[in-house]
Amino acid sequence: MTGIEQKTPVGGSETGGADGLYAVLPLRDIVVFPHMIVPLFVGREKSIRALEEVMGVDKQILLATQKNAADDDPAPDAIYEIGTIANVLQLLKLPDGTVKVLVEGTARAKISKFTDREDYHEAYAAALQEPEEDAVEIEALARSVVSDFENYVKLNKKISPEVVGTASQIDDYSKLADTVASHLAIKIPEKQEMLSVLSVRERLEKALSFMEAEISVLQVEKRIRSRVKRQMEKTQREYYLNEQMKAIQKELGDSEDGRDEVAEIEERITKTKLSKEAREKALAELKKLRSMSPMSAEATVVRNYLDWLLSIPWGKKSKVKQDLNFAQEVLDAEHFGLGKVKERIVEYLAVQARSTKIKGPILCLVGPPGVGKTSLARSIAKATGREYVRMSLGGVRDEAEIRGHRRTYIGSMPGKVIQSMKKAKKSNPLFLLDEIDKMGQDFRGDPSSAMLEVLDPKQNATFMDHYLEVEYDLSNVMFVTTANTMNIPGPLLDRMEIIRIAGYTEDEKLEIAKRHLLPKAIKDHALQPKEFSVTEDALRNVIRHYTREAGVRSLEREVMTLARKAVTEILKTKKKSVKITDKNLSDYLGVEKFRFGQIDGEDQVGVVTGLAWTEVGGELLTIEGVMMPGKGRMTVTGNLRDVMKESISAAASYVRSRAIDFGIEPPLFDKRDIHVHVPEGATPKDGPSAGIAMVTAIVSVLTGIPVRKDIAMTGEVTLRGRVLPIGGLKEKLLATLRGGIKKVLIPEENAKDLAEIPDNVKNNLEIVPVSRVGEVLKHALVRQPEPIEWTEQENPTAVPPVEDEAGASLAH
């Protein structure tokens, strides 16, 4: 083979005395004896090169076991000096780069020294000769070895019985000793010791010694296994007899038990205030139960049914508190702000105090995460004196989870509504249906349609669960649902009273942190109020620079972080107290995560700040436009959905129709391409409320007039230049305030909504209502575009279409 130095033949003499030069193959976890044919898998580069070398000469290699199997590149002193000279019978390269080789041991050899060869291990070694010995003694030993080996194989199931037949036919006692040694389950050093012994008599004695020790251990193992097996058989027999005895006892004495059980159920039916239909159903099932064998499967189904029917509350009502002042105190103590919700609850209690026939209201609290929708429901239950049960609808896809499974199915149960009523133990609890906008639907049905019956005040008095098969009155239940968005099926939405919970203002968050989050953090972390304090300025900085959310969930996490670090500091430094101020805040929370009140440094052409409303609150939306030489195409990017792309198209058409008024020569549209991009391309965006921002960006690009950096805007635009109203005004104004922008343009028709905006928000912003695009440009552009005179050419070019770009939803 190429690259082989032909100085000395690789492969030495098998006669004793003279050393031969051999390529060495270090072995891991195996000792190869003479007369053995063994397959080996070789993966190390040096070993593969050694094999390739010997395949090119006379196919002999020295197999020597290394002392540490974990050593990838063993040094000469890490390899045992006694090895086996072997013939390479077959060599096969595998696809993964390793080599499968079949070797046959021929003779023992002793390594005298290793060469300095680096590409593979190479050593001088001499084949070892066996000494002459007493043939009679060896034959006697051999017979004992064969006999013991037969017993060993019988006890050790890992060795094939055919090996015994092969061993008994071997006439060469040296080969017999090596064959037996290779099959013994002994450690590598012990096998190496067997290889190192030249005397056949000593090898046979060692094999005999190892086998006798192993046979005694294997016999003990066999006895243990037999004892365990007998014990298991005895246990199983006892279990079987016990079960038989129980069955016989049931047959003999169950008539008494059965009568007692039936009598108990009958008594429960009498005491429970069931409806007429439910009582008839219960008595009919009881009659069936009387005629059944108590141990039958049908009897178990009937008993479970009656247990469910009698366990749910029938006419058991909590006494609803009607003290309006108490209710107001509870709601105010546990939640700051949320005036509309509190007002609605107090109104309900006031009406209930005058009329007992009023049905429970079905409220739907819609707002971003972390504003307190779920915790508010618990406070309402406390204020009204009702039991509180919660059912999460997130990810519910099966109608049976609402209405239950029919009794024909094995293991059927009532739906979650009836299960929750059983848990409440009263027929008029406050029932929270959490995340109602997260319900899905699939081939098993539409759970939102099943909820129609639950949430309709005129239908839920006769709610029918598939398992119970009788009507159950839910009209006294006070249902409260929560959702992040209004993405709820229309018929379901129509049955609920929507109460929007907008995001909190900075001052509201500050009050919540002082009144609720800080005391909670102190309590949860086993601190004393004097040990841990946070200044008002520090809390305000946490709100501004470490959180950006509509709710207070992230704010709570940051306050908890401060408390944890305070506890750690007190225990480590033995301080008596930790005070967090705006100066040392970054030592505890790290670098600021968000900018507050910092806007881009200069007015730019084609860069407009729009406003977006998402399910997690309001956001600033940067809109960028550029113009380049082209053929009048318009490109839109930024993961925009259809409504937003149509809004850009309408804005472009409006600007083109009024080009002369904006000082733009109409032919410019056919000679230039415009690219409108909304950054953060990974976030899907949709909605029409960025219309006036799109118009401003396009006009700025075409005229070269910069847009003011300190102004934000929101409003839908029409082809006639009118500005239409938008939703989510409070959330958008809060986002404007967070972003440090002082002036905001809103549609004139939204001016009436300003009455519901907190005064501290309105006082910190200059809010300008606008009704037409002209007013928008007057406020937004650094200077007004100058109209020009233009004579229209023949065959005017049509407005180019907007190119499609894919995207997903984000409401504006």
Swiss-Prot record:
Entry's Gene Ontology cellular component terms: cytoplasm
Induction details: By heat shock.
Positions of region (Disordered): 787-812
Active site feature: S689, K732
Record GO terms (molecular function): ATP binding; ATP hydrolysis activity; ATP-dependent peptidase activity; sequence-specific DNA binding; serine-type endopeptidase activity
UniProt keyword annotation of Coiled coil present: no
Name the record gives this protein: Lon protease
Gene behind this protein: lon
